[in-house]
Amino acid sequence: MNIPERISALRALMEERGYDVYMVPTDDFHQSEYVGDHFKVREYITGFTGSAGTAVFTKDEAGLWTDGRYFLQADQQLAGTGVKLYKMGEPGVPTVEEFIASALPEGGTLGFDGRVVAIEEGAALEEAVASKDAKINYSEDLVGEVWTDRPALSEKPAFALGEEYTGESTESKLARVREAMKKAGADVHVIAALDDVCWITNLRGDDVDFFPLLLSYAVITMDEMKLYIDERKLNDDMKADLAKNNITIHPYNAIYEDIKNLDTASTVLVDPNRLNYALFNNIPGGTKVVQQVNPTIAMKAKKNDVEIRNIINAHKKDAVAMTKWMYWLKTNIGKIEITELSAAAKLETLRKEQEGYLWQSFEPICASGEHAAIVHYEPTPETDVPLTQNGLFLTDTGGGYLEGSTDISRTFAFGELTQQMKEDFTTVLQCNFNLAHAVFLEGTTGYNLDVLARMPAWRRGINFNHGTGHDVGYLMNIHEASCGFRCAIREKEQAPLMAGLVITDEPGIYIEGSHGVRTENELLVRKGPKNEYGQFLYFEPITYVPIDLDAIIPEMLTDQEREQLNEYHKKVYEIVAPH
């Protein structure tokens, strides 16, 4: 079936089951940003492959809501499907909830699979339908019924990380989580976020492409942890280690029934953005519930000394591979045919030469020419093109190593560039350095500093429609949720920057139909001086890959910026030259 046929089949089921509006989010059962093949339901029904977006269907309308990273991509992928693009945050564009409220008839029914909707979003939908005296049915996955050849859940095995990589035992992590539970007044903590479960157990898996995560849930009490997982993923040594910490193993889906049997005298801690609506609604009525951010988010964001040492080593390895790749690209462009996909394949070959390399840490972005204006463009056999011999090649890639994950963007210059390309490249470098050299007091948030990265672009009347940076997980999610750099305030994401945090600095400029530039380094937050004003913090760049000097206009740089660039390249040379 093509996309219009799939939508027609969905509408037939909506009519049969009595749904007036049906919503299809991106998430899996764990509110993951990136999902395994089994959970790519929104992609199946719309054809849009981006990592963020929500589809809504009525009897005669279909819409997809996504953010600024994906406007160009969605516009192209939705063409001919009958699905209308709604650009989130743009003037005059209704929110998903506003659209649903207007589309529902009085007394109508909104449907969705409650396992792929977070508690907080479910509450917002309850408010939306209340205005029409409508009801919600969250018990059916209608698209799953249409998708007859849907991939099965992953059955890939888990692997364990020793303390030489994690720097902390499961016993210690559980003790810290239980202490946080006490502070919250809770004696039960229900966790669905895959990276939180993996962090606590020091286990990793391969259930989501590029992300070493295990499909699992956890319920933690003061004396036990129940791990809900396909037991076949665990070997005997893992089971024995879990048992030492009184972690019992239960079938993956059994949590939905087990939650119904919680003691109503208990107090349950849940994260409204990281636990699904269906699971939440299975908590017995009358049970006290505390809704707050999972304590593990801050715990895993602050890297310990062992993790920091390992992460820096991973970046040194990655720098060797990236620098070899840069040399290969610059010396072979125009001599042999290099396409977006073949360039990405060459980089992975070079990364595989590094000890401890596992796999790419996310789908590589290798975008030549006008493709680079699509913020998260990922080449496919259908879109793959030869690299332009006169223009820019934007790359955003990463490697997953036993010592940690990397995330790096470099834009390479080939042949003759236009003046605007050079100006944009130089401006992005200024944006990157302006943020990277900030010194700030403890308690400062990413919101406070984001303007530093945007100011050089804003002075030219240019903006980039995405966040400037995100914190990075230790061989888990490449995007972690504790904080980030962005100018659009999100009420729930205002955690301060703290020593031990690893965060990206990735400004960009994107010119539709022409080119795109992004320069990204990872930054480690370090402690600086402490005095009567408080504890000062600063950033240490831990990405050690050359910036392409062929695209820079030196006259645009201040003396200080030139000195910063030279100092950065001196550090890069010291690390990479021996290899």
Task: Say what each PLM segment does.
Residues 1-579:
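Active-site neighborhoods and metal-handling regions in enzymes and metal-associated proteins
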